[in-house]
Amino acid sequence: MRFVLRLLALLVVLGVVAWAAVARPSLPAAERGRRLAERSGCFTCHGPGGIRGVANAGRADLTVPGFEGDVMMFAKNDDEIREWIRDGVTRAKAGSESWRAARDRGALRMPAYGDRFGQDGLDDLVAYVNAAAGNPAPEDSLAKAGLARVEELGCVGCHGPGGRLAPRNPGSLKGYVPSWDGRDFGELVRDRREFHQWLANGISDRFAKDPFARHFLERAAPTSPSRASRAT
């Protein structure tokens, strides 16, 4: 009897350890960057989520550039995005007298954050700017069609542009909506069959049979909807 009790206790401990590993937050870089940008006040000028800049009186373009579309007019690559954040200007723009004059006419100007965010924070911010801007865009025609479809279905409303964000989700196991390009996706979707189950039913058969997983899925604020009749 004592052996059985010890065995049961061991199984319980192993189960708790396994679930603790699954429950450990694993935010993708773009989401870490979004949260850092929010904490740092970036959206005060670049607008909600950085996609709609506020008015900037005195400038010919009238507004602070947003990350969605406008960003590639000012930053051609990741290094230039880093320069904007770290130095408040790219090396290319800094050498332009006309650009400096235009900047000085504006009421608002990009601050130079220097080393405030560290290399990891800087990389996370770059990841978020790219996600908000839709970079890199898919090159494969099937991937392009899929991206257009998930935008049409509203999937990006919770998962963010390209499925790369992880917005807060109170009540869920990890406290956020899982992204499609992070570690969470592999834990939730093991194969194509499970992907279809999530899409059709809002839950996989594996998770539906697990009372612990079902408990957290049911108490989450936004839950994955069933799209059986709309995804085709």
Locate the predicted segments by residue.
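N-terminal export/targeting leaders of redox proteins
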Residues: 1-35
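C-terminal capping alpha-helices of c-type cytochrome domains
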Residues: 19-21, 26, 84, 109-138, ...
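Periplasmic/extracellular electron-transfer cofactor-ligation site
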Residues: 34, 38-63, 89-102, 134-135, ...
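Short, solvent-exposed loop/helix junctions and linker helices
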Residues: 39, 74-75, 116-119, 152, ...
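Conserved beta-strand positions that form and line the central face of beta-propeller blades
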Residues: 66, 109-112, 179
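Structured beta->alpha junctions
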Residues: 71-73, 114, 184
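An amphipathic alpha-helix signature
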Residues: 78-86, 90, 119-130, 189-200, ...
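Interfacial juxtamembrane loops and adjacent helix segments
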Residues: 104-106
